[in-house]
């Protein structure tokens, strides 16, 4: 009887698969084995794409005449650092007694690519290959994945998309980086007083750099506009009402106004004060009940954004933490774009909740959900939607592995608690508020106030994080509530005072690592063309698995961005701005979110079988040829000096450090 070989993406995951089998496993160098089963692993990528000089030694030198470089057949090679493990895996894959191969690499595009490259270079033939697709590392889920494993051929479209993504990044990186470095590198190096300067370009990386530079320039060009509002304070409750222009007002359609509730000049606001009378009457009062539903569950981008706000940690650090929590069976698969449950999981979601009932911090809420049966209708709610899931459902707690929590760092347990509370909150009712809107008339002018008064905490009772300091929130006083409850249309009121309050417009906020991750995920919304925006509205820049790494590369490797580690605020460096100028003048479309998102849309279409790999490759090749030839034709390196000089005025002595350390207001 032949053996089954299980191949995982990393040793820790392989151990979890091995532990699932009721077998005595012997440990060998690079694998484990029993009478029926062999378990081995990769170290992430074991195989990579070969550099151009492997095709032709002449390509080692960067010369414009060798571009564009688009090979007919791509070459691959085993990473030198992984050669020993690759040889072990190759030997196991081709062992005569191995009949079945279970592919247990990460359940996603990149995990598929990792195995397909190993398979390709190992020359696997005449073996039954099955794909294990799981959503968590719990024993039950691993066993289900093995039981329901499908022929690897069912994932061929995903494999095609994975290969194309790698070819796209490879070809754009090599061709555009070389072309722009040859054209502009010497001029840039001279300007910066450096020996060399490489213009590093990437499909996603360059677009993200452009977004940060664009935002920084918007902030620089922003001119604050002062405006003046008129505030009246009601007696005796101290309720503040703000004047707004209404039909019948002396200032209706007046050019003196800044929007509908302020003035451009202080003297005009003070003139209004002289028109107002302390005695007023209620013009309108409305009292409505408003509900606020629990937010959708976490996907990776949303969790990374919240962790930046809550803990001031980078998206990369967040991903490392939740990957560890996943491998310790505490959370489901982390690299997901979905924010909902699958209907299959929703049917048995009480199992997760029962597990959490043993967690002291949230046992009260979990037990309440179980006792009241609040989980029973979740399958019919907006929190369950199979149509909004591609590879994996949202990140949720498994309810298992709780014993591992005691040995985890506090930051990890805080992130875990964040996911747990978001998960439990969806089973609770909405929070309820009483919304009161008040319009008071004084000498024909209208002053307004609105309030949201909490009436039922609902799901917010679950969101009481143990790691946050309890702060007394300022709310409306009971005296004010009593006054508002007593008022009706026509009721007389009295103002104790009026004042002019100065304000000013504020510039756009700099991106933090967290807000950039969300901006990358929602890149389709940045597109101005309505038709194109509708076509790719669900596409982002990069993927949930790659976004954090791209930001890290821009900061730590290329030094195109600066990161304030305390606030996680991103700002461009002088080099980053110069590269952006260089790209804008040569291959401007690389800075476009619409182009970058449309490439990602194309990859999704390939993975779904809606576009062939050949069609995609043809479009990619045409794009590279056109733009490389465009760079060849433009002799604009010296012209760029005036842009570099202008950029440098914002990076004088000590100025770059100052900009880097700026915190958000």
Give the positions of each predicted feature:
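Intrinsically disordered, low-complexity regulatory segments
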Residues: 1-178, 378, 468, 507
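Conserved short loop/turn motifs at secondary-structure junctions
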Residues: 2-3, 104-107, 196-198, 287-296, ...
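Basic, low-complexity terminal or inter-domain segments flanking catalytic cores
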Residues: 2-5, 28, 93, 121, ...
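Short active-site loop/helix that positions an aromatic residue
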Residues: 14-22, 116-117, 209-219, 421
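C-terminal or mid-to-C-terminal helical accessory/interaction module adjacent to the motor/catalytic core
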Residues: 74, 87, 96, 139-234, ...
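C-terminal helical "lid" subdomain and adjoining coupling/linker elements of P-loop NTPases
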Residues: 191-200, 211-266, 310, 458-460
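Metal- or metallocofactor-binding catalytic centers and their adjacent structured scaffolds
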Residues: 254-296, 304
